[in-house]
Design a protein with these regions (language model features):
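Metal-dependent phosphohydrolase cores
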Residues: 1-171
Length: 171
């Protein structure tokens, strides 16, 4: 999935203030899937979401789409070291259920996010988080892009899903 130079410049303009934030940079410290950091995973989801919206003319708000995709896993902990499943009562404390809430709290703490961005972050794990349903097209796009990226990253341990030529600091 290739984005044009113009599309990459658009993403850079939208996400510059978020990408430069020290807390966002901490996502580089944590592994998400395979050997892919949480930071790179979020970038992959941004690129795939943006590509889907542009190529299929889905009409999503590109700013909300990019910001929500970039912050959807802004949870800032190593989920591999969290306690494992130990009975039904601990089920909803597991990473898959709990991390959208952590990402939402961190995004609210660091940035003034919109209602669409809130919905994108809190519902990106749907249907696992069945009470948090995507209510806007941007959230549906990110939900699908996240699953696509997660499968590729987990199965193939690829650090670049959307574009194998993209540098770490490029969109």
């Amino acid at each position: 999935m290739q984005l044009s130079d113009t599309e990459r410049q658009c993403l850079t303009a939208i996400l510059a203030q978020y990408d430069q934030h020290p807390e966002v940079q901490r996502m580089r410290e944590f592994i998400q899937h395979g050997d892919v950091t949480t930071y790179q995973h979020c970038k992959n989801v941004v690129l795939v979401s943006f590509w889907l919206n542009r190529r299929f003319h889905l009409g999503a708000d590109e700013t909300s789409l990019a910001v929500g995709a970039f912050l959807h896993d802004f949870y800032l902990y190593d989920w591999h070291k969290r306690s494992s499943f130990r009975g039904l009562r601990r089920l909803f404390e597991m990473h898959g259920f709990a991390h959208p809430g952590s990402a939402y709290v961190n995004a609210e703490r660091c940035f003034a996010i919109t209602r669409k961005e809130q919905n994108i972050i809190s519902s990106h794990m749907w249907p696992l988080t069945f009470r948090h349903v995507p209510t806007c097209r941007e959230a549906v796009i990110v939900c699908l892009a996240d699953k696509y990226c997660a499968v590729l990253e987990s199965m193939f341990q690829r650090t670049r899903v959307a574009d194998t030529n993209a540098g770490e600091n490029e969109w």
